[in-house]
Amino acid sequence: MTLRIHGIPASRAIRPLWAATELGLAFDHVITDYKGGHTRTPEFLALNPNGHIPALEDDTPAGKVVVWESMACSLYIAKAHGKGDGSDLSCANLKEEGEALRWAFWVMTEMEKDALTVLMHRMAMPEAERKADLAEAAEGRLRVPLRVLEGVLSSEAALGHEYLCANRFTVADLCVASVGMWIRPSSGLMTEFPLTAAWLKRCLDRPAHQAARKLGR
Protein backbone atom coordinates (compact mmCIF):
# COMPACT_ATOMS: atom_id res chain seq x y z
CA MET A 1 0.00 0.00 0.00
CA THR A 2 1.14 3.53 -0.73
CA LEU A 3 0.05 6.22 1.71
CA ARG A 4 0.24 9.87 0.69
CA ILE A 5 -0.44 12.72 3.11
CA HIS A 6 -0.99 16.21 1.73
CA GLY A 7 -0.26 19.16 4.00
CA ILE A 8 2.40 20.80 6.14
CA PRO A 9 3.23 20.28 9.82
CA ALA A 10 2.32 23.87 10.72
CA SER A 11 -1.35 23.12 10.18
CA ARG A 12 -3.97 20.56 11.16
CA ALA A 13 -2.04 18.15 8.92
CA ILE A 14 0.31 17.60 11.86
CA ARG A 15 -2.30 15.15 13.15
CA PRO A 16 -2.08 12.51 10.41
CA LEU A 17 1.62 13.22 9.90
CA TRP A 18 2.18 12.50 13.59
CA ALA A 19 0.03 9.36 13.46
CA ALA A 20 1.90 7.96 10.47
CA THR A 21 5.27 8.81 12.01
CA GLU A 22 4.23 7.27 15.33
CA LEU A 23 3.49 4.01 13.53
CA GLY A 24 6.80 4.10 11.67
CA LEU A 25 5.07 4.04 8.30
CA ALA A 26 6.78 4.66 4.99
CA PHE A 27 4.60 7.32 3.40
CA ASP A 28 4.79 10.06 0.81
CA HIS A 29 4.56 13.52 2.31
CA VAL A 30 3.15 15.81 -0.37
CA ILE A 31 4.01 19.31 0.84
CA THR A 32 0.87 21.37 0.33
CA ASP A 33 0.65 24.78 1.97
CA TYR A 34 -2.68 26.38 2.78
CA LYS A 35 -1.27 29.66 1.47
CA GLY A 36 -0.64 30.67 -2.12
CA GLY A 37 -3.58 28.88 -3.67
CA HIS A 38 -2.03 25.42 -3.39
CA THR A 39 -5.25 23.94 -2.03
CA ARG A 40 -7.34 25.54 -4.78
CA THR A 41 -5.82 23.80 -7.77
CA PRO A 42 -8.03 21.43 -9.77
CA GLU A 43 -5.79 18.54 -8.76
CA PHE A 44 -6.12 19.21 -5.04
CA LEU A 45 -9.83 20.01 -5.21
CA ALA A 46 -10.33 16.61 -6.82
CA LEU A 47 -8.98 15.15 -3.57
CA ASN A 48 -10.69 17.52 -1.16
CA PRO A 49 -13.43 19.70 -2.64
CA ASN A 50 -13.35 21.80 0.55
CA GLY A 51 -9.92 23.08 -0.44
CA HIS A 52 -8.36 22.39 2.97
CA ILE A 53 -5.42 20.38 4.25
CA PRO A 54 -4.88 17.67 5.22
CA ALA A 55 -6.01 15.09 2.73
CA LEU A 56 -4.69 11.59 2.37
CA GLU A 57 -4.68 8.94 -0.31
CA ASP A 58 -4.16 5.29 0.50
CA ASP A 59 -3.73 2.71 -2.25
CA THR A 60 -5.26 -0.42 -0.76
CA PRO A 61 -6.08 -3.84 -2.24
CA ALA A 62 -9.72 -2.73 -2.32
CA GLY A 63 -8.86 0.44 -4.26
CA LYS A 64 -7.75 3.97 -3.48
CA VAL A 65 -9.12 5.47 -0.28
CA VAL A 66 -9.31 9.27 0.01
CA VAL A 67 -9.87 10.84 3.41
CA TRP A 68 -10.04 14.47 4.47
CA GLU A 69 -10.59 16.16 7.84
CA SER A 70 -7.61 15.89 10.16
CA MET A 71 -9.22 13.78 12.87
CA ALA A 72 -10.72 11.40 10.32
CA CYS A 73 -7.30 11.06 8.67
CA SER A 74 -5.63 10.29 12.00
CA LEU A 75 -8.26 7.75 13.06
CA TYR A 76 -8.09 6.12 9.62
CA ILE A 77 -4.31 5.78 9.74
CA ALA A 78 -4.46 4.20 13.18
CA LYS A 79 -7.13 1.71 12.17
CA ALA A 80 -5.83 0.89 8.68
CA HIS A 81 -2.13 0.74 9.49
CA GLY A 82 -1.88 0.01 13.21
CA LYS A 83 -1.46 -3.52 14.55
CA GLY A 84 -4.60 -3.35 16.67
CA ASP A 85 -3.03 -5.51 19.36
CA GLY A 86 -2.26 -2.94 22.03
CA SER A 87 1.35 -2.48 20.96
CA ASP A 88 0.96 0.88 19.20
CA LEU A 89 -1.40 3.87 19.05
CA SER A 90 -4.15 1.93 17.27
CA CYS A 91 -7.18 0.72 19.20
CA ALA A 92 -6.95 -2.84 20.47
CA ASN A 93 -10.68 -3.44 20.92
CA LEU A 94 -14.11 -1.85 20.51
CA LYS A 95 -13.91 -0.19 23.92
CA GLU A 96 -10.75 1.68 22.95
CA GLU A 97 -12.16 2.49 19.52
CA GLY A 98 -15.30 3.96 21.02
CA GLU A 99 -13.25 6.05 23.42
CA ALA A 100 -10.96 7.29 20.64
CA LEU A 101 -13.96 8.36 18.57
CA ARG A 102 -15.47 10.06 21.59
CA TRP A 103 -12.31 12.03 22.34
CA ALA A 104 -11.75 13.04 18.71
CA PHE A 105 -15.29 14.39 18.35
CA TRP A 106 -15.20 15.95 21.82
CA VAL A 107 -12.02 17.93 21.32
CA MET A 108 -13.18 19.31 17.99
CA THR A 109 -16.55 20.32 19.44
CA GLU A 110 -15.50 21.55 22.87
CA MET A 111 -11.97 22.90 22.45
CA GLU A 112 -10.64 23.48 18.96
CA LYS A 113 -12.26 26.81 18.10
CA ASP A 114 -11.24 28.49 21.34
CA ALA A 115 -7.81 26.85 21.35
CA LEU A 116 -7.17 28.29 17.90
CA THR A 117 -8.24 31.73 19.10
CA VAL A 118 -5.74 31.49 21.95
CA LEU A 119 -2.95 30.39 19.60
CA MET A 120 -3.62 33.17 17.11
CA HIS A 121 -4.01 36.01 19.60
CA ARG A 122 -1.27 34.93 22.01
CA MET A 123 1.45 33.94 19.54
CA ALA A 124 0.76 33.29 15.87
CA MET A 125 -0.58 36.61 14.62
CA PRO A 126 1.60 39.72 14.28
CA GLU A 127 1.63 41.41 17.67
CA ALA A 128 -0.11 44.52 16.37
CA GLU A 129 -3.07 42.42 15.22
CA ARG A 130 -3.55 40.41 18.40
CA LYS A 131 -6.55 41.11 20.58
CA ALA A 132 -6.03 40.20 24.21
CA ASP A 133 -9.74 40.39 24.98
CA LEU A 134 -10.50 37.65 22.45
CA ALA A 135 -7.77 35.44 23.90
CA GLU A 136 -8.99 36.02 27.45
CA ALA A 137 -12.59 35.21 26.55
CA ALA A 138 -11.49 32.00 24.81
CA GLU A 139 -9.38 31.03 27.82
CA GLY A 140 -12.38 31.51 30.06
CA ARG A 141 -14.49 29.19 27.93
CA LEU A 142 -11.69 26.62 27.74
CA ARG A 143 -11.70 26.17 31.49
CA VAL A 144 -14.91 24.14 31.16
CA PRO A 145 -13.54 21.36 28.89
CA LEU A 146 -10.16 21.51 30.60
CA ARG A 147 -11.87 20.66 33.89
CA VAL A 148 -13.40 17.64 32.17
CA LEU A 149 -10.00 16.56 30.83
CA GLU A 150 -8.34 17.10 34.20
CA GLY A 151 -11.00 14.98 35.89
CA VAL A 152 -10.56 12.08 33.49
CA LEU A 153 -6.78 12.20 33.84
CA SER A 154 -7.20 12.21 37.62
CA SER A 155 -9.35 9.08 37.42
CA GLU A 156 -6.82 7.39 35.14
CA ALA A 157 -3.94 8.40 37.43
CA ALA A 158 -5.72 6.70 40.33
CA LEU A 159 -5.45 3.48 38.31
CA GLY A 160 -1.77 4.08 37.63
CA HIS A 161 -2.43 5.18 34.05
CA GLU A 162 -0.78 8.13 32.31
CA TYR A 163 -3.01 8.40 29.24
CA LEU A 164 -6.66 8.85 28.34
CA CYS A 165 -8.20 5.53 27.45
CA ALA A 166 -5.59 2.83 27.92
CA ASN A 167 -2.42 2.42 29.89
CA ARG A 168 -0.47 3.57 26.84
CA PHE A 169 -0.39 6.40 24.27
CA THR A 170 -3.19 5.94 21.72
CA VAL A 171 -4.74 7.84 18.85
CA ALA A 172 -7.15 9.32 21.40
CA ASP A 173 -4.24 11.07 23.12
CA LEU A 174 -2.87 12.22 19.77
CA CYS A 175 -6.17 13.78 18.75
CA VAL A 176 -6.68 15.69 21.98
CA ALA A 177 -3.03 16.70 22.41
CA SER A 178 -2.90 18.07 18.86
CA VAL A 179 -5.52 20.61 19.90
CA GLY A 180 -4.28 21.09 23.44
CA MET A 181 -0.89 22.20 22.20
CA TRP A 182 -2.50 25.34 20.79
CA ILE A 183 -3.27 26.47 24.34
CA ARG A 184 0.32 26.34 25.54
CA PRO A 185 1.06 29.99 24.62
CA SER A 186 -1.63 31.00 27.13
CA SER A 187 0.05 32.59 30.10
CA GLY A 188 -1.03 30.81 33.25
CA LEU A 189 -4.04 28.84 31.99
CA MET A 190 -2.34 25.45 31.96
CA THR A 191 -0.98 25.97 35.48
CA GLU A 192 -4.58 25.60 36.68
CA PHE A 193 -4.65 22.06 35.28
CA PRO A 194 -1.43 20.33 36.35
CA LEU A 195 -2.40 16.80 35.33
CA THR A 196 -3.41 18.03 31.88
CA ALA A 197 -0.19 20.03 31.54
CA ALA A 198 1.93 17.00 32.48
CA TRP A 199 -0.03 14.69 30.16
CA LEU A 200 0.27 17.19 27.30
CA LYS A 201 4.02 17.43 27.79
CA ARG A 202 4.32 13.62 27.71
CA CYS A 203 2.44 13.51 24.42
CA LEU A 204 4.25 16.38 22.72
CA ASP A 205 7.69 15.23 23.88
CA ARG A 206 7.27 11.93 22.04
CA PRO A 207 9.98 11.47 19.38
CA ALA A 208 7.39 10.85 16.66
CA HIS A 209 5.73 14.19 17.31
CA GLN A 210 9.06 15.99 17.27
CA ALA A 211 10.00 14.24 14.02
CA ALA A 212 6.66 14.98 12.37
CA ARG A 213 7.02 18.68 13.10
CA LYS A 214 10.28 18.71 11.11
CA LEU A 215 8.86 17.08 7.97
CA GLY A 216 9.34 19.10 4.83
CA ARG A 217 12.07 21.32 6.24
Task: Cite the ranges covered by each PLM segment.
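Residue-level recognition of oxygen-bearing side chains
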Residues: 72, 195, 208
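A generic structural-conservation signal
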Residues: 29, 192, 212-213
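C-terminal helix/juxtamembrane-tail motif
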Residues: 216-217
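GST-like fold's C-terminal all-alpha helical module
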Residues: 95, 104-201, 205
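GST-like domain detector, emphasizing the conserved glutathione-binding G-site
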Residues: 1-132
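Active-site-flanking alpha-helical
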Residues: 78, 179-180, 213
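Generic structural signal for individual residues within well-ordered alpha-helical segments
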Residues: 45, 98-101, 175, 197, ...
